[in-house]
Every structure is written in structure tokens, then in C-alpha cells.
Amino acid sequence: ALKEAVKRQTTMDIQPFFTEEEKKQFFSKYKQLLRHLYSFLKKEDLSKMKELMKRVVALDCYGRDKNGINGLLRNIDTAMIATTEIGLKRTSVIALLLYRPVMKKIITLDEVKTTFDADVTLIISRLLKTSDLYARNTAVDSENFHKLLFSFAEDVRVILIMIADRLCLMRLGKQLKNDEARKRLATEVSYLYAPLAHRLGLYTIKSELEDLSLKYTDRKQYDFIKQKLNETKRSRDAYIAEFITPIKSKLEEAGLRFDIKGRTKSIHSINNKLKKQNIPFEDICDLFAIRI
């Protein structure tokens, strides 16, 4: 039924809800999302979600935003990030998927509460509060805005959903209409959401947000560092493997259970070193880190 709703939307004459390429993406991503949801959603919840999704798609709830980004694809991408990369479960994911329909008054909070529960409704209402705060404030890099945002969000799950949404937007950055829009988003993310991700232990997400922020604010420097890393990748990987081998042997001899990994430091981190130490790329000694 949802597939039929999607097919009907693609027949719209003016700026179609789905291009042919987006339609293919939708079917693929929707199947992936359902596979993840099956692991923690009851059949009853899934059935209710499918019915509501069919309804809101048919009513063009997810339309395109001011940058032309498909709202439904963005929502599904955000839900995938929230579940697979952050670890959010039932209540948060249902709230994430139904937030926009509630905001557009296609579904009411009372209906959500009756269909699911009060906790889902609570998260949606807090997401609505934070959305309203954004609409009324332009100085997102001010300390006052941050305090208001945290007081409005109240629940850490709301903050985690917002981090997932910003990561999704940053990955879609090339679809933003102009450089100015990308720079505004990058500035907001580097000032607010990357530090938040770090504070909440989402280190991989924090690094990606910072790298993408640099990409959108200083593309020349980003490309320079990326190229240098690519040029030295083979020798660096060999050195990391050689470095790890004796440590791994000693840990195994001690009978310890462990996980040891080597990783190249992020582009953002390397850029900070270049600036602070005022040295050429070739003089950086610690391009990688070992984590045990």
C-alpha cells in the first residue's frame, strides 16, 4: 500500500514528490529500515506505522524543503542513522518518523498517544518545541540559544534525534542550493552538534560532523589534507599493522580479552594541528592513533 502511495506521488506534474532515481532509493532504504525495525518493534507497532506512513505519503506530508531535498527520504535516512549508528530504539524512532506529520497537522498528538503511547507523544512535543525555537532564533551560535535548546529538549533522546538529523543533512550537503546555506549549516554543526556528539560519546559521528564542516567551510584545505592522506595511506597502514603486532602478541600471552584498532586521525584534527603548530603536512608525526 505504501508503494502504491509513492507511485501516485511520482505522477505529480510540478516538482514531483519522487524522481525516478529517488523512487528507487526509497524502496531500497525503506526495506533496510524495516529490517532494522523488525529487531525491536512489535508486529502491532509495525502495522500501525505502515498504515500511518501510507496515509501521510498520500497527503504529500513530506514534500520537499526549501533546498529541494525530499522530506521522506531525509526522514528515512535520519531514522537509519538513529537506529544503526546511535542505537535509538522504539519510542525515539516512532517519534522521529511521525514528528513531521504532527507538525503539519496531518496527525494529532492525541492520535499518536492513542495509537502508540504517551512517551512517543512526549518526544514529538519536545521536538516541536525545539523546531519552534529554531524558527524564532537566528543566532544559533549564541550561548543563550544553547541553553534554551537544552531546556526545550529536556530529554537526551530529543538531542540524539537532532544529532542524527544534522548528520543526515550534512551528508546531503551537496544538495543544498548554495555555498552560503552549506556554510551556515556547517557553522551550526561545528559549534553545537559536534561538541554535543563528543559529550555523548558519539566519537565517530563527532569526527564525521567536523570533517564535513571543514569540507563546506574550507574546501581547498579539506581536499589538500585528504589528498595527502591518500598519498601516504599504503605506508601508513603498513606502519600501523607493524606497530600493533607486538602489542597484540603481549596481550594474547597475558590471556586478556581485548580489541585493538589503528585509525588515521580525522581531517579536522589534522587541520587543527597544521594551524596550531604552523608546520607543513610532512612534519606531522602523529597521523594515526591506536585504541585498545
What is the meaning of each model-derived region?
Residues 92-97, 162:
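Short alpha-helical catalytic segment bearing the HExxH-like zincin motif
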Residues 3-41, 51-65, 74-85, 89, ...:
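Nucleic-acid processing machinery
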Residues 97-126, 202:
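Hydrophobic or amphipathic alpha-helical targeting/insertion segments
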Residues 36-50, 109-119:
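Short, mixed-charge amphipathic alpha-helical segments
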